[in-house]
Regions:
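Conserved C-terminal structural/oligomerization subdomain of aldehyde/semialdehyde dehydrogenase
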Residues: 50, 100, 104-216
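ALDH superfamily catalytic-core signature
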Residues: 5-114, 177
């Protein structure tokens, strides 16, 4: 079945709070043998979502925070579309007039964009997700690490040993297994990023040490 609990989980990890979470799922690399299945499953989940006033009970996804950030997201989507990548804007709009007037963007899936495009290379911080196929684990790891950012990563597989092997090669401060984001956080572990995602840690023993002063 194309639409699975995994597709629902991936949706939540990227589109929670309209994608406006620092540790949200940024890019999705899928083995080519499962690519079509994941694309269709995730599309089915996204198409059920209702975008609109976040105070209404029928709404699944609210607006982007401000006009500037909305433009950042829509510019990324537009650049990807202009480059020839397929873009699928999913979901339903509860109030068309409000949607046009507000800072709304339906959940957008961008299929196999070039690695150099902003939707892949930069942080979108909004409701858009690039999905790229890969053929080998080495390729997936290389492409995942091909970024100036390195806050969070995740590995999704039923093979725990393979997941651990891959996770040790990812250049990120935190790696989740079959999960992603704040709802999967273990507060006993230090949290922070590599590269341009910052320095230092909070949470865990190491996080406490960051706030200590030393007197010799």
């Amino acid at each position: 079945q194309a639409e699975s609990s995994a597709a629902s989980d991936v949706y939540k990890r990227q589109f929670m709070s309209s994608g406006q979470i620092c540790m949200a799922l940024k890019r999705l690399y899928v083995h080519r043998s499962r690519y079509d299945e994941v694309v269709e499953g995730l599309s089915a989940v996204c198409n059920r979502m209702v975008v609109g006033d976040g105070l209404l009970p029928e709404t699944n996804m609210g607006p982007v925070n401000n006009a500037k950030q909305l433009k950042t997201v829509t510019d990324m989507i537009g650049q990807a579309r202009a480059s020839g990548a397929e873009v699928r804007e999913c979901g339903q709009v509860s109030d068309e007039a409000l949607y046009r007037r507000g800072y709304f963007q339906k959940p957008a899936l961008v299929f196999n964009p070039d690695q150099s495009l902003d939707i892949v290379a930069e942080e979108q911080f909004g409701p858009a997700l690039p999905i790229m196929p890969f053929d080998t684990e080495d390729e997936a790891i290389r492409r995942a690490n091909d970024s100036r950012y390195g806050l969070c990563s995740s590995v999704w597989t039923e093979d725990r040993d393979r997941a651990l092997s891959i996770s040790r090669q990812l250049e990120a401060g935190y790696t989740y297994l079959n999960n992603h984001g704040p709802t999967a956080q273990d507060f006993r572990g230090p949290f922070g990023g590599f590269k341009d995602s910052g320095f230092g840690r909070n949470l865990g023993y190491e996080g406490v040490v960051q706030f200590q002063g030393y007197h010799s």
